[in-house]
Design a protein with these regions (language model features):
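C-terminal alpha-helical "lid/dimerization" subdomain adjacent to the S-adenosyl-L-methionine
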Residues: 13-16, 133-193
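A short acidic, Gly/Pro-enriched loop at the edge of an enzyme's catalytic core
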Residues: 91-103
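A short SAM/SAH-binding and catalytic strip from SAM-dependent methyltransferases
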Residues: 102-114
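A short glycine-rich, Lys/Arg-flanked "PGG" loop and its adjoining helix->strand segment in the class I
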Residues: 116-128
Length: 206
């Protein structure tokens, strides 16, 4: 698997190429977390967001499909007693409905064949009045970041689509979510963060 191979060098690449955004995204996501929260993180990667969230919540379950990525996350969070690192498939989560106060899925929906179904799965496991937080790198057409994404795709990253801010917002609207807040972390490869407030309307889209 590409991501198992990439796990050992992923942090080095991110810090060298897009370090400002890489660091700021974790901090921005952490602002959505409350002390009593039970949090599910999908596609945790090497744990860049996990280490920002863990000290702020009651419980964090960090998941990924790549064993290589999970090993890197486990190293980063080993000092925390409230974190569990688990292999999981984001397309079919083995958790009951309305389990978590917050659900996070960072930089993954552009890799998926059916991201619409996955967003609904994230909402399914989130409690009413909870939040689903979805950070995703975005690119302007013909920008340096778009060209870099294309190169990574050729290397095996498996990008299925690229978003700009407008198409990112449109994606959530077309899935059926209206109560969504957005913020943008600026940098070489910017990161758009969508925060879905899980209300009755959100649940009805599942």
């Amino acid at each position: 698997m590409f991501w198992d191979r990439a796990a050992l060098v992923y942090d080095y690449f991110e810090r060298a190429y897009n370090g400002k955004v890489y660091r700021a995204t974790g901090k921005a996501v952490a602002e959505e977390i409350a002390p009593d929260d039970h949090v599910l993180e999908c596609a945790c990667g090497t744990g860049a967001i996990s280490v920002c969230v863990a000290p702020l919540c009651a419980k964090l379950i960090a998941t990924d499909f790549s064993n290589g990525m999970l090993k890197q996350t486990a190293k980063k969070v080993k000092r925390f007693t409230n974190v569990e690192v688990v292999r999981a498939d984001i397309t079919k989560l083995d958790f009951a409905d309305s389990t978590f106060d917050k659900v996070i899925a960072g930089n993954v929906i552009h890799l998926l064949d059916n991201p619409q179904a996955v967003v609904k799965e994230l909402v399914r496991v989130c409690k009413p009045n909870g939040k689903v937080v979805v950070p995703t790198y975005i690119n302007k057409k013909n920008s340096k970041s778009a060209k870099m994404a294309a190169l990574l795709g050729k290397a095996g990253a498996g990008f299925k689509r690229q978003f700009d801010m407008e198409s990112y917002q449109r994606f959530f609207s077309e899935v059926g979510y209206r109560n969504v807040a957005y913020r943008l972390v600026e940098g070489i490869m910017p990161c758009a963060i969508a925060v879905i407030s899980v209300d009755n309307q959100s649940i009805q889209t599942i």
